[in-house]
Amino acid sequence: MTDTGFFTETLDSRDPDIFGAIRKELGRQRDEIELIASENIVSRAVLEAQGSVLTNKYAEGYPGKRYYGGCQYVDIVEELAIERAKQLFGCEFANVQPNSGSQMNQAVFLALLQPGDTFMGLDLNSGGHLTHGSPVNMSGKWFNVVSYGVRQQDQLLDMDEIRKKAHEHKPKLILAGGTAYSRVWDWAEFRKIADEVGAWLMVDMAHIAGLVAGGQHPSPLPNAHVVTTTTHKSLRGPRGGMVLTNDADIAKKINSAVFPGLQGGPLMHVIAAKAVAFGEALRPDFKDYAAQVVANARAMADELMKGGIDIVSGGTDNHLCLADLRPKGVTGKATEAALGRAHITCNKNGVPFDPEKPFVTSGIRLGAPAGTTRGFKEDEFRQIARWIVEVVDGLAANGEEGNAEVEARVKAEVEALCARFPLYNGL
């Protein structure tokens, strides 16, 4: 057999273009401060599991009930992922096959709703997600969505409005959870409202799952009928999703909805990486990590407010804060770009009752999980906040074209900080 290098040639030789792009991305992650709240940095072990030979294996079905042969070892992997997820969140049932956060939510809708049914979800402008009923998303196109939001005076969830809307519209399902809400969710009150109108309570805890696992946010599982979460973000695993419940009937419906309802063969290499991340989150030091994430987010929010940047709801109880830039007279879009040039990565984000268009916005969303994984503590996050204020003030004074000197100065200081907290040595 002629040796074509198929089993031996490394990526740098076989595809230098892709190898080069990956190396550049590694350099970006090493040299920039990552503040996107939905991003994190996985362990070397998670990377290794996701890049394993499990990518070769098709495994339609569930452990012990596959439609393909040769699944005895991937069954071990998936069973470990399931058992670790159940232990981590104290639940009876876990489906670890959803490929993404959108698909995990779609699976619940497929299991519990019919097209045209009514459900309630947090409005995108108040910190919800596209899959919580946005009109441009499948969830908003296939179902009758009644959105709820926050109060204008304090940007906190308006539980009176939520109860009133639930009694008025009688939804079949109420969805709690969001992507840009920085305060503690009252799961018990949501369940009370759901029970009053005979609705399912679904919680999407994608953003705060790591904080729940680490004991820094109340778990929704004692109250929710079904819980979804991504496995990355604050949970620090690979990109993917899962569905949790304590109800055997719902678990059966969810399993059927994920496969064969929504997906075919699961991504076994990703499920292996999920299992590794769950194992890491079960270690005692993960509780320390979760506590540090919250402490860092609070320090950053506090320092931003000292610098004259408004923080939605006046602070944070979790891993993120939402900065309202209107007092500074700059937009989220311009600020995201300016901070990017200074090697601070974040995302533009709408604020409650935002007058700007979705691709412009009046705010930026800032998260602590990735920086905390890197080793940053409160002092580093306060310094990061001061750099953000410096860039924003420069942007307000000099405009987008005249802020290069400020951005270059901050960039040099950012790179010096990053050099003290290296990523993936030897990779």
From Swiss-Prot:
One BP term from GO: tetrahydrofolate interconversion
Catalytic activity annotation: (6R)-5,10-methylene-5,6,7,8-tetrahydrofolate + glycine + H2O = (6S)-5,6,7,8-tetrahydrofolate + L-serine
Gene Ontology molecular function, alphabetical: glycine hydroxymethyltransferase activity; pyridoxal phosphate binding
Residues recorded as bearing N6-(pyridoxal phosphate)lysine in the entry: 233
Site annotation Plays an important role in substrate specificity: residues: 232
Keyword terms of this UniProt record: Amino-acid biosynthesis, Cytoplasm, One-carbon metabolism, Pyridoxal phosphate, Transferase
Record family assignment: Belongs to the SHMT family.
Role noted for this protein: Catalyzes the reversible interconversion of serine and glycine with tetrahydrofolate (THF) serving as the one-carbon carrier. This reaction serves as the major source of one-carbon groups required for the biosynthesis of purines, thymidylate, methionine, and other important biomolecules. Also exhibits THF-independent aldolase activity toward beta-hydroxyamino acids, producing glycine and aldehydes, via a retro-aldol mechanism.
Protein name according to UniProt: Serine hydroxymethyltransferase
Gene3D superfamilies: Aspartate Aminotransferase, domain 1, Type I PLP-dependent aspartate aminotransferase-like (Major domain)
Domain of life of the organism encoding this protein: Bacteria
Alphabetized HAMAP family for the sequence: SHMT (MF_00051)
Taxon lineage: Bacteria, Pseudomonadati, Pseudomonadota, Alphaproteobacteria, Rhodobacterales
Pathway info: One-carbon metabolism; tetrahydrofolate interconversion; Amino-acid biosynthesis; glycine biosynthesis; glycine from L-serine: step 1/1
Recorded GO CC terms: cytosol
Assembly mode: Homodimer.
Gene from which this protein is expressed: glyA
Main subcellular location of this protein, as a coarse class: cytoplasm
Record-listed (6S)-5,6,7,8-tetrahydrofolate binding positions: 124, 128-130
Cross-referenced PROSITE patterns: SHMT
EC nos: 2.1.2.1
Compartment(s) where it occurs, according to its Swiss-Prot or TrEMBL record: Cytoplasm
Cofactor: pyridoxal 5'-phosphate
